[in-house]
Amino acid sequence: MKKTIKYSILGLAALCTVLLCGGDYMLGYSLKPDDLVSRSRNIAASYDFMYERYPELHPWVDSLMTAGVLKDFYIENDRGETLHALYVAAAHPTLKTAVIVHGYTDNAVRMLMIGYLYNKEMDFNILLPDLYGHGMSEGNHAQMGWKDRLDVLQWTETADELFGRRHTDSVASRSTEMVVHGISMGAATTMMVSGEVEHGQYQQPFIKCFVEDCGYTSVWDEFRGELKAQFNLPAFPLLHTANWLCRQEYGWDFLEASALEQVKKCTLPMLFIHGDADTFVPTWMVYPLYEAKPEPKELWIVPGATHAMSYKDYPQEYTEHVKKFVGKYIH
């Protein structure tokens, strides 16, 4: 009997150890991928990649750099972390402003095609943050949009000060009119932001609308899907263990990091974009997001587009959809 109890305890301890090790591996694999260093931190390679994929960016960026108008900006967030962004004022003085949010293991440079859309095509001021742990911002892990939502809210205030309130001339002495536009994890971040801007301490009356492109419903749903797709494993027990470890180590969990719950609180306009061939953030996710979001809202399902490729595959149509939607709310 004593041996049975002893072996049972040892077996349980071994099982717990395996679960904790497996959960810790999954957490590191998800929030500290190698690409955070090799891809997101490599700014020179990011410019080269963007110039090859979007050749129209090269002369535009060169002209901005020559004129000295593609600028760096740094802030310190409420947690004392130093964050970086790129920003460019419009060619003509305006209050129209876009804050553009990148995806998982990307950086501000890798969102310059959307910067081009707003700054070159629409004559908007633009600000492109490096999220925590990405690009030139401080940090060693991805926050999957949840804590990033608070940083992006701070960046919207910074953009409003850069392009609006801090100026004394008649054009820019008022608050800006702002759109927040994100892709992939940046789209999830955008939706998480959307649930805050009309409520409590985070109210941002200068934000007029949102564009989300291929964002996920929640971190839990995204990780559950990837656990199945990459490792053919069910959510239980590994995802539950990683979720608990995330709460202990980082102070948030995969379930609370829900874009779906956030959009339910948002009554500002939102454009939903998703490729119908997306398997990384599967297309099905956009439908409950769209249904949960109160009006006004619009949905564009992009034929044949894989993950985060809607602009690349349909640049003219993408530009026209964004122009038409944003133009209804920012004049």
Question: For each of these PLM feature ranges, what is it?
Answer:
Residues 4-9, 14-74:
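An N-terminal hydrophobic leader/cap segment in hydrolases
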Residues 77-159:
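Membrane-embedded segments
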Residues 114, 259, 268, 282-291:
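Short alpha-helix in the alpha/beta-hydrolase fold that links the catalytic acid
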Residues 150-176:
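Conserved acidic catalytic loop of the alpha/beta-hydrolase fold
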Residues 192-252:
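Hydrolase active-site cap/lid region
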Residues 265-267, 272-274, 278:
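Short beta-strand/loop motif that positions the catalytic acidic residue
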Residues 291-308:
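Catalytic histidine neighborhood in serine/cysteine hydrolases
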Residues 313-331:
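Catalytic active-site module of serine/aspartate enzymes centered on a nucleophile-bearing elbow/loop
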